[in-house]
């Protein structure tokens, strides 16, 4: 069996640096192999050049290491949101663009995305902490702007953020699971679905979540009519 080359003793205070090296090595193995079967503590230790016990000083087990890997991955999501949202004044359009950016982000690195949502450890994960502190704060701020415009009650902001996330996550997960389906070029179907969710949710936010289908149909027809009372064509 191939031995692990000895790594020189790290200087005092370099534990955080070693943890970053461990996360990088695990990320590389994930991307190289396409799943986590190759990401054993021994394999990661070999890649970094340390002994397996050194890994356990920083991560309790493989699941904890994978959680840290996925958390680092999701740190990039806020930057993706900023790239599409900064400079967009309309909060509704901003919410839509962030939803599309989420789907693009998820489908660009499927192995990391799948593993991030496969973890089932009790309590908040590092991924949850990262999202709550960055990307989701940006979404919540946008939804709060919509609430200030009267599209939702302010008390519904958290619920609406969860609904928008569920929609984006759902379409991203289905695109990853069924890539052979006709999704259209440049995420066309994903954009159509997310646009329907954003516009539909703001409409219901104004009319009331318990609005019946017939009442919504009547309201939509009324909005479609021209000022003289004729149907708008």
Where are these regions (language model features)?
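Helix-turn-helix
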Residues: 21, 32-64, 68
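Generic hydrophobic, amphipathic alpha-helix propensity
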Residues: 18-27, 44, 69-73, 77, ...
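Hydrophobic/aromatic-rich alpha-helical bundle segments in the mid-to-C-terminal region
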Residues: 124-129, 133, 148-196, 204-224
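Hydrophobic alpha-helical connector segments
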Residues: 82-112, 136, 164
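Short amphipathic alpha-helical elements of helix-turn-helix/winged-helix folds
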Residues: 25-32, 105
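Amphipathic alpha-helical interaction segments
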Residues: 21, 43, 97, 101, ...
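Amphipathic alpha-helical linker/stalk segments
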Residues: 72-96, 127-130, 140, 144-147
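N-terminal intrinsically disordered/low-complexity leader segments
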Residues: 1-17, 28, 205-233
